[in-house]
Amino acid sequence: MMRNWLWLLISVASAAAAEPPPRIELTFTLTRNGSTMAEVTELLQYAAGNYQLTETWKGKGFYALLGSARRQSIGTIENGVLRPREFFDERSGRDTARAWFDWKAQTLTMQYKGTRGVEPLPPNAQDRLSFLFALSLLPGSKSDSVSYSIADGKGLSRHTYKLVGRERIRTPVGEFDTVKAARQGDDRETAEVWLAPQYSYIPIRLLVVDKDGKRMEQLPTRISQ
């Protein structure tokens, strides 16, 4: 019964969550066990049902030796469902990983290190970048959980997330009332995402803790629209 009431409260509070902002840019600090690893910038652009999500990484301190990274996801949002069309992940010193989603033909094409493979499009397919954006649509949907088949250009993994409550959090750019989602069914690590209603439920904090206790956390340092 309490779970049903929790879901009802989240649903009522997020009735307008399905429409992303036309533009929002967030800069994060990524830390590992409290030490700064990188500055991460995420830029979302959305118009007429089409989105483009671009993420860039710049290593800090010792991690600057690892260079930089850039990922991009392009696709559509139809009836509250996010459908990526193209994805790439390019990093210093590595081959670029790519994925193409053909929703009409129901095929997924992935390419890495010169090898390209085609396979049937799995259920609720997302890419490594788009699935976090897709989570922002969950509070406005008819369910409190969702499972994604996530492609990164090299392979597929299955992730299930569930809305677990509301929480007020403190960040370097202020305090926010959030809806919290947690990954389910993974014994290797815990993953939690805090979605900000103030910004159309875009993820504003991420925390991953592996089985050895290593903490990877991402917190915002700048938000602009």
Functional labels for PLM-detected ranges:
Residues 93-136:
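Hydrophobic, well-structured mid-protein blocks that either form specific transmembrane helices
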Residues 19-103, 137-225:
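Acidic, serine/threonine-rich low-complexity disordered tracts
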Residues 1-2, 50:
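Intrinsically disordered, low-complexity regions enriched in Ser/Pro/Gly/Gln/His and often acidic
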Residues 2, 13-14, 212:
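Alpha-helical transmembrane segments and their juxtamembrane interfaces
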Residues 2-8:
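Sec-dependent signal peptide recognition
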Residues 9-18:
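Hydrophobic h-region of N-terminal signal peptides that target proteins for export
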